[in-house]
Amino acid sequence: MRIFRKTILVLTAILLSGVGATHLRAQTRAAVSGTPEALVADLYRAQKSKRGPFFQTRSRALVDKYFEKGLGDLIWKDARTSKGEVGVIDGDPLYDAQDMEIKHFAIGKSRMEEGRALVDATFENFGEKKTITYILVKGAAGWRIRDIVYAEGRTLKSEFKDAR
């Protein structure tokens, strides 16, 4: 009986320490995911695993997870109205390219400017160095992407405006 009780106590202690460690990892993940650069990194991960918000019509919530309403509306409308054909977004908007051979990919630390966070994604595509800047704003649901800035000041929003 004593051995049984000790075994139960030891197992309970092990279980509780595991729960505590899991809780700590979850808190750390939540804290990291609350940053602008974490949202951008998650967007790239989702797109790489073919579960990104672009070119899909299954889930508006997936678009809203990453983008502020204005840009989200444009992305969603483009996906829905293009019906599997090429829409306004005619390449991968995360790399500003149709063909990709990505090397030296990095997401920089966010910097604040005029109440917005700016996050740079840098990489080489077929040997050409590129920087794409994400403009994020913080709302009730956390950080969301307001626009994406490409070379020479062209933006994802401007692509939609030019297509009208």
Task: List PLM regions with ranges.
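Bacterial N-terminal signal peptides that target proteins for export
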Residues: M1-L11, G20
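C-terminal segment of classical bacterial N-terminal signal peptides
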Residues: L16-L24
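Short, low-complexity N-terminal intrinsically disordered segments enriched in polar/charged residues
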Residues: L24-T57
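Surface-exposed, charged secondary-structure patches
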Residues: Q27, F67-E128
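Extracytoplasmic/secreted envelope proteins and their assembly/folding machinery
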Residues: E37-Y44, R60, G72, T133, ...
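Short, solvent-exposed secondary-structure junction/capping segments
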Residues: K48, G52, Q56-R80
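Low-complexity, intrinsically disordered terminal/linker segments enriched in charged
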Residues: R80, M112-R116, D120, N125-K129, ...
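Short beta-strand edge segments in extracellular beta-sheet folds
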Residues: I135-V137
